[in-house]
Amino acid sequence: MAQFLTEDFLLDTEFARRLYHDYAKDQPIYDYHCHLPPEQIAENTRFKNLYDIWLKGDHYKWRAMRTNGVAERFCTGDASDREKFDAWAATVPHTIGNPLYHWTHLELRRPFGITGKLLSPATADEIWQRGNELLAQDSFSARGIMQKMNVKMVGTTDDPIDDLRHHKAIAADGSFNIKVLPSWRPDKAFNIEAAGFNDYMQRLEAAADTSISRFADLCTALNKRMDHFAAHGCKVSDHALDVVVYGEADEATLDGILARRLAGNQPSTEETAQFKTAVLLFLSGEYHRREWVQQYHIGALRNNNSRMFNLVGPDIGFDSINDQPLAQPLSRLLDAQGLRNALPKTILYCLNPRDNEVIGTMVGNFQGEGAAGKMQFGSGWWFNDQKDGMQRQMTQLAQLGLLSRFVGMLTDSRSFLSYTRHEYFRRILCQMIGRWVEDGEAPADIELLGSMVKNICFDNAKQYFAIEL
């Protein structure tokens, strides 16, 4: 019987242990997509306590706590920090089998060095006290934790209207050597059906100093803001395509759709598809010209609980997996980009694991141009960011494409403690390849497979994003 969370956690073959300890473990972290607040990095935030750094804003934990019968005031409400931590500690023993159980204890081990103790009501006092003692040290500031975890690059998620002053301040600080770059997230500029679209157009007009009344005006405004992002080192875009749509329209039609929306009229389903397609095609052309990477996160069903949305807002744990078809509209969208000779490097993530093979085969349709792994099937995302989900994604990527060209893991997280997800991913990767060797499905060539693991952990992403570190 294996012990829980030893140095060989998940490494169930000798070959896996060699791969992890000799090739994966000490690789730096290239976290190309996350939701860390750049302000906290710029200001080198010091966290008040374990709640402040660990539970605040964590919708994964809130979902588990609600499922465990914890009242909302202990999740997002007015309970004290310690009361919220205690509610989490009481929930943790019930999360066995959920990735939260592994994540929790990996995060206690690194960076806190708390080992041999499982979080529960019986250990809550000791862990609370020890964690808070460490957080009082300079080395446990936001930047200190990033340095402890050997992070080399972080890509935050930023709106086109953001002024990026925090990124500018970080870049100007010669004492901090981790790249913190903005990523362009223009969802609000193409979600024409959204309630806040007209208000957002006014804010975009102000940020770009451009009046927007026609489709060409919107493109001009977005182009100006992309120039601003490029000046701050941006090389990556990201888009939430909850449902993939495709529709063709000429510019006069697009002008009419935009004018009617700005006048307060809701677009039809067809008009929404036409407008979104046009914006995405314009953007992809700019990404290709600027040599940016585009990411599509596909298939979320958001804000399902209207009562809770009205009480506490979005992004607090009431989202789930969508089941809308995506193959045909996604194919047409990518094909249209290719026909314009404007298909940039692209990473596709699907939230519904049913779509793994759809994405795994779709990326193969558009590879080429002498770029290894130009089109990527992205790592297991959100509800798939767990052992089974990552194994499925990597297995299907290997079967349908080239695992060796995979750009690997990202945290997609708002927490400075989530870097152990890279460790978790690396252990799962080494476990999987080690089992292939054990079963005679891959050669026991440590240099060949070790190099492959090293590339997936760091080097492939470094080469793919082409950002100078």
From Swiss-Prot:
Q: Which residues cross the membrane?
A: none
Pfam families registered for this protein in UniProt: UxaC (PF02614)
Q: Which InterPro entries match?
A: Metal_Hydrolase, Uronate_isomerase
Which EC numbers characterise this protein's activity in its record?
5.3.1.12
Q: Which GO terms describe its molecular function?
A: glucuronate isomerase activity
Question: Catalyses which reaction?
Answer: D-glucuronate = D-fructuronate; aldehydo-D-galacturonate = keto-D-tagaturonate
Provide a GO biological process annotation: D-galacturonate catabolic process
Q: Does the keyword Transport apply?
A: no
Q: Which UniProt keywords apply?
A: Isomerase
Its pathway, per UniProt, is: Carbohydrate metabolism; pentose and glucuronate interconversion
Q: What class of enzyme is it?
A: isomerase
Is Isomerase set as a keyword in this record? yes
By sequence similarity, the record places it as follows: Belongs to the metallo-dependent hydrolases superfamily. Uronate isomerase family.
Instruction: Please state what the protein is called.
Output: Uronate isomerase
The protein's organism comes out as Yersinia enterocolitica serotype O:8 / biotype 1B (strain NCTC 13174 / 8081)
- What gene, per UniProt, encodes this protein? uxaC
